[in-house]
Amino acid sequence: MTTGLSNPAVREYLRVVALEYALFRQESGEWLEQYKFEALPSLNQQLDVAGISAENIGKIVETLRKGNPQRGTFVHFTNIVDLTNLSAKEPQLTAELLRGLFDESRPLAARIEAFRDRARQVMPEIRLGTPLFGYIMAAFDMVRYLLYKDETFRRITSLLGIE
């Protein structure tokens, strides 16, 4: 028995679902996320991992705040407010943590957990949700760090029989 993408029935099902979804979005006009495709390229041009420093971390966080629209946001505003407060309180640490997110010699989960752990040592109540990290990384490089909704990703991988 073939499973996952090797199963012709699954492949045809996914093709039809993708087509129907695209048609629905075009016809209904309900797809209100075009802003993401406009905001991320602009952020990618403004932000550079190599340029992260304690001296400019406030400006970087402000750029992230401004790039996160009021409606249909990438990340809840409270996470950006907390990141702003962290950068004001501990600019050196914040710059170090932000650079650490892009250290690909370590697994992504470890990088995010290290960021959270060290930030909570300074601000125990800081809110640093998963969407914040996805947004930060996509803001620096939207090609390398794609944004996707975790629930949708998990459902698709389950459907395809991918662990």
Q: What kind of feature is each model-predicted range?
A:
Residues M1-I126, D141-E163:
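An N-terminal alpha-helical hairpin/helix-loop-helix interaction module that forms a charged
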Residues F133-F140:
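Contiguous, well-ordered alpha-helical segments that form the cores/surfaces of helical PPI scaffolds
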